[in-house]
Amino acid sequence: MDKYQDRYLAHQKRKAELLKSSYGTPDFQTYSKEEQDTFFTVVKNRCSQRSFVSEEIDISNILYAIDRSPNSCDRKGVYPVVVSERKDKEILSGLLVGGVGWMHRADKIILLIADMDCYKNPAEKGFMPYLDAGALLTSAYLAAEVSNYGCCFVNPNIRDENKEFFMSRFGLKDNEILCGALAIGKYELKHTR
């Protein structure tokens, strides 16, 4: 057994206990009309930002949102790696095809890395890590928006001749894959949202 299977079994136990319990208990969180409106305003206003200013940001709330995101049976097979060193950001800006020429200006880049040992069913290995990463990045986008930070998803496309260097430089193991990256920073106010 591994940590992913342990998390899966704990998830199954929680789910079984929930199904045995009565729904609608006073502990169940509900939201006021005002809270609902605020949430949907955040959803409506969220947009991708590729223009950043040089200002350090605190992404602890974004990392918290990523940690609390839904994922395959709560296994947490996709995890974030924060890149903040200028040299590493410049390297990523050259390696990730979608980030060329702008991504290094973000204060932080979050790599979404999948540990393929988490995914047990061979039929799911080709898509499930990307679905999990999608849930994480949605939470990160909304957390960035409510924190007044710009955020943009960069697809995991790396040219074949650069993949080995990327894996080595950013410490990925043979059983790990990049599912994408998020560039996050204070956005340039002169650009319309």
Question: Where would I find each of the regions flagged by the language model?
Answer:
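Small-aliphatic-rich amphipathic alpha-helix that forms the alpha element of a beta-alpha
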Residues: 65-69, 110, 123-166
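A short coil-to-beta-strand element that immediately follows conserved catalytic motifs
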Residues: 76, 149-153, 177
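Short connector loops/turns at beta-strand edges and beta->alpha or beta->beta junctions
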Residues: 115-117
